[in-house]
């Protein structure tokens, strides 16, 4: 398992739309350069890892929209100025979040199971703990190809940065700090 971190503001180039298939070119026209740059970086990295041409790679999508590419499992996350591309030889999910003031207790009560709530509400830095738990929950649902609305299906216990999954056939989860002011987590099958 490995992941690459990019500072999006440092990626100052015009994307090569010829590396993208027509559907992604149309999406880039709607969403802008940042989308095109992210997709170009992803396709170039997949090409480096597989030897395939970036424009010829055909992704499939899970019922909840997770992009899949069987020759090289991957996942993408971006927040604010941070982009993370994660790769593994089996299923993988990644999430990065920029920490910012928000009503995290309300979000936590809506999306987290009791074991997760206990893990961050009893600690001294609830904002950091919340974002760590949130990233772990997102990484787990993305690993499964599911949606955050189903996060309670993937319970875990949180203890000082350590994630212990509480369900059968659970993946490994590692937390990390991709850059100052950001938190990340990656879930991957061993």
Where are these regions (language model features)?
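Core catalytic alpha/beta fold that binds nucleotide/phospho-ligands
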Residues: 1-190
């Amino acid at each position: 398992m490995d992941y690459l971190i990019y500072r999006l503001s440092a990626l100052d180039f015009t994307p090569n739309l010829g590396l993208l298939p027509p559907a992604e070119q149309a999406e880039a026209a709607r969403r802008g350069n940042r989308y095109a740059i992210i997709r170009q970086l992803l396709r170039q990295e997949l090409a480096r890892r597989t030897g395939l041409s970036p424009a010829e790679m055909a992704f499939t999508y899970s019922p909840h929209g997770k992009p899949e590419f069987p020759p090289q499992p991957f996942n993408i996350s971006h927040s604010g100025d941070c982009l993370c591309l994660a790769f593994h030889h089996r299923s993988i999910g990644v999430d990065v979040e920029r920490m910012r003031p928000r009503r995290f207790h309300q979000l936590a009560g809506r999306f987290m199971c009791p074991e997760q709530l206990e893990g961050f509400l009893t600690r001294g830095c609830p904002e950091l703990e919340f974002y760590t738990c949130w990233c772990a929950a997102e990484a787990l649902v993305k690993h499964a190809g599911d949606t955050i609305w189903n996060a309670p299906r993937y319970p875990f216990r949180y203890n000082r940065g350590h994630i212990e999954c509480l369900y059968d056939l659970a993946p490994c989860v590692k937390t990390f700090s991709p850059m100052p002011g950001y938190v990340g987590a990656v879930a991957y099958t061993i």
